[in-house]
A protein has these predicted regions:
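Conserved mid-domain beta->alpha element of the FAD-binding
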Residues: 32-51
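Mid-to-C-terminal Rossmann-like scaffold of FAD/NAD(P)H-dependent oxidoreductases
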Residues: 2-8, 45, 49-106
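Short beta-alpha connecting loops at secondary-structure transitions
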Residues: 28, 32, 102-105
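FAD-site-proximal beta/loop scaffold in flavoenzymes
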Residues: 1-31, 73-74
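Residues in flexible loops and secondary-structure boundaries
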Residues: 20-21, 34, 38, 80
Length: 106
């Protein structure tokens, strides 16, 4: 999808970083131009999501995913640099489109 606020074309993906292609997760600037700290937090979220989706996270798998989602949100909200105005609203729209197109995923 195209979003000027996210820096241009980005793959459709959900909050858990999953794409419409089963087993493919994304993180970092491919999901929108943000700080390196946000990219690292997204990488940890993608990893937690993959482990949980594969059934390898045990009883705490979903908890780890939720913690990683909160970490991404916290890191984004406290970023020293915002590269594009309206990035929060654009992410909300992206995640809504994901839900409408692909469902809740995991």
């Amino acid at each position: 999808m195209y979003s000027p606020e996210l820096g241009g074309h980005v793959p459709l993906h959900g909050e858990r970083m999953e794409t419409s292609l089963k087993g493919l997760y994304v993180a970092g600037n491919i999901t929108g131009i943000e700080s390196g700290l946000v990219a690292m937090a997204q990488g940890r979220l993608a990893a937690a999501s993959m482990v949980h989706a594969a059934g390898l996270g045990g009883a705490k798998g979903e908890q780890r995913v939720q913690e990683a989602i909160r970490e991404v949100d916290f890191t984004r909200k406290h970023a020293l640099i915002q590269f594009h105005p309206g990035i929060t609203e654009a992410r909300t729209q992206l995640y809504q489109q994901w839900e409408q197109t692909c469902g809740s995923g995991v």
